[in-house]
Amino acid sequence: GSLVKLVSTLLSLVPSLMKG
């Protein structure tokens, strides 16, 4: 459902956040 899409979005943003 929408939860999968939400998780996918978060996983896509994580690398950007970790790079600062």
Swiss-Prot record:
Transmembrane annotation, as ranges: none
Q: Where Methionine sulfoxide occurs along the chain?
A: 18
Annotated positions of the Lysine amide modification: 19
Where in the cell is the protein located?
A: Secreted
Say where the protein is mainly found. secreted
Q: In which tissues is it expressed?
A: Expressed by the venom gland.
> What GO cellular-component annotations does this UniProt entry give?
extracellular region
Alphabetized UniProt keyword annotations: Amidation, Antimicrobial, Oxidation, Secreted
- What does the PTM comment state? The peptide spanning residues 2 to 19 occurs in 3 forms and has been given 3 different names. U1-PONTX-Dq3a has an amidated Lys-19, U1-PONTX-Dq3c has an amidated Lys-19 and an oxidized Met-18, and U1-PONTX-Dq3b has no modifications at either Met-18 or Lys-19.
Provide the protein name. Answer: Poneritoxin
Native species = Dinoponera quadriceps
